[in-house]
């Protein structure tokens, strides 16, 4: 098994969303998180930069459902160079219009973390 090259942290919002998922979906989430932790170069089918933001998104596909998790590289502006990643919030993608609200939610969560820190 590969050694971890990235450490991941979860917000309470992410953990709450994850807790509500079925086992099959949780397994897919865990798989993508393992890739993020162990692969220096992560394929864009798993992580993409969100243009015009400071965030990336993790992509989790389960059947026809497309889940997204907004993530933040704590110690670098580049995801590939990052050693610490924060999973901010997750959602079931319904449309691209939804991203504006989810990005705002991610900013609020990140703001809370930078002001007081409640990493897990």
Task: State the predicted function of each range.
Residues 1-66, 77-84, 92-120:
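Basic, Lys/Arg-enriched alpha-helical interface segments
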């Amino acid at each position: 098994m590969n050694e971890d090259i990235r450490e991941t942290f979860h917000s309470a919002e992410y953990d709450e969303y994850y807790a509500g998922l079925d086992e099959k979906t949780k397994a897919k989430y865990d798989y993508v998180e393992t890739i993020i932790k162990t692969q220096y170069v992560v394929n864009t089918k798993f992580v993409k930069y969100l243009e015009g933001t400071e965030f990336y998104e993790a992509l989790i596909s389960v059947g026809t459902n497309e889940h997204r998790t907004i993530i933040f590289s704590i110690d670098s502006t580049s995801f590939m160079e990052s050693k610490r990643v924060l999973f901010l919030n997750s959602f079931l993608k319904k449309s691209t219009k939804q991203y504006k609200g989810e990005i705002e939610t991610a900013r609020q969560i990140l703001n809370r973390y930078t002001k007081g820190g409640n990493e897990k």
